C-alpha cells in the first residue's frame, strides 16, 4: 500500500483556501481511482506530486500547479492498453504512427484531454504539463520540466545510475534546463539500450534540444 502522505504533509508553501480545497479534492479523487486497484501507481503519483512541489519551490515554478499536475499525471494508467488507445481515438490524439507503437506515451495526453473537463478550475498549464510528461518538448516551460523530471526521479524510483545523476543535478541546484536535458536524454538512451520503439517525435525533440544547447 502507499505510504500515508497528503499534500499537506511537510508543505513549505502557504496555499489559499481555494487551492487547498482543490488539492484536497484531487487527492481524494486519486485515492478513489487507484489506491486499491493500483497501490504502487497511487504511491508513485503522490511521490511525484511531492517531488514536483519541492522542485517548483526551488526553481520558481508554481507549486500549486506542480502539486496538481503531479497528482493527476498518471490518471489514465489504470486503463488497459486497449482502453488507452480507444480513449486516444475518442479525443482524436494522433502522433502520426500506429497507436500500438506509442501506447505507453498516450496516458498523459488522454488524461490532459479529459480531465480539463472534470476540473475546469485548474489552470491551463497543468494540462500542458501532464500532456508533456511522457514525450517532452523542445519548448518546455518550467512547470513542464518540473513534472517531467519529478516523474523520473521521485524517491520510489530505483537508484540506477541515470536517475542518480539527475537527482544529483537537482540536489546541486543545477539549471532546470540542464536537469531536464539529463532526464530526457537518459530516457532516450534507455529506449535505445532496451531496443524498444523510439517515437520519431522524440528524435525531433532530441535534435532540437541538442542544437539549442549549442547556441
Model-identified regions with their sequence ranges:
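Generic N-terminal amphipathic, Lys/Arg-enriched alpha-helix
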Residues: 3-37
Amino acid at each position: 500500500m502507499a505510504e500515508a502522505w497528503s499534500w499537506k504533509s511537510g508543505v513549505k508553501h502557504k496555499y489559499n483556501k481555494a487551492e487547498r480545497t482543490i488539492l484536497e479534492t484531487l487527492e481524494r479523487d486519486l485515492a478513489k481511482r487507484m489506491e486499491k486497484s493500483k497501490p504502487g501507481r497511487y504511491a508513485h503519483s503522490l511521490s511525484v506530486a511531492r517531488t514536483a512541489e519541492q522542485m517548483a519551490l526551488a526553481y520558481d515554478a508554481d507549486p500549486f500547479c506542480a502539486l496538481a499536475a503531479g497528482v493527476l499525471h498518471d490518471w489514465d494508467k489504470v486503463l488497459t492498453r486497449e482502453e488507452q488507445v480507444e480513449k486516444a481515438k475518442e479525443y482524436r490524439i494522433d502522433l502520426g504512427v500506429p497507436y500500438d507503437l506509442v501506447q505507453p506515451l498516450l496516458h498523459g495526453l488522454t488524461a490532459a484531454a479529459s480531465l480539463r473537463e472534470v476540473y475546469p478550475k485548474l489552470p491551463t498549464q497543468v494540462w500542458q504539463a501532464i500532456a508533456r510528461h511522457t514525450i517532452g518538448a523542445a519548448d518546455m516551460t518550467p512547470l513542464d520540466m518540473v513534472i517531467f523530471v519529478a516523474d523520473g526521479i521521485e524517491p520510489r524510483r530505483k537508484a540506477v545510475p541515470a536517475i542518480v545523476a539527475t537527482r544529483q543535478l537537482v540536489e546541486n541546484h543545477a539549471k532546470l534546463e540542464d536537469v531536464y536535458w539529463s532526464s530526457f536524454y537518459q530516457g532516450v538512451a534507455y529506449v535505445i539500450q532496451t531496443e524498444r520503439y523510439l517515437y520519431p517525435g522524440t528524435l525531433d525533440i532530441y535534435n532540437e534540444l541538442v542544437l539549442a544547447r549549442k547556441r
